[in-house]
Amino acid sequence: MSRPVGPYSPFVSAGGWVVTSGQVGIVVGENGPELVPGGTTAELTQALANVAAVLEEAGAQMSDVVTATLYLVDMGDYAAANQVWTEAFGDHRPARTAVAVAGLPVGARCEVAVWAWVDGAR
């Protein structure tokens, strides 16, 4: 899991909840965190991998996600984002909100934040 690019925690646990900070499609490169090349599809694939890594550190997994927020700089990428989303979540279908935004940190084209429930009381 890469370190946050700002003054915040990657996740916070409260009761059975794990709440992640927004994750963008960054990897740790030679010069620190950098966006993966390839546009929104590649960035979202990496952002969701980053979400999975944060959840794992918190003792959760993607199948524990109850709700998610997807931020997109270009809503024209919505259909492609849905395909990446389906690949990441498989048959699991958490609630989701998609929001169009004017910009995101580090020039990202997408960002994902999730809430997961981990104590089994669904």
Q: Language-model features: where?
A:
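Short, polar/acidic, helix-capping and beta-turn segments at strand->helix junctions
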Residues: 1-122
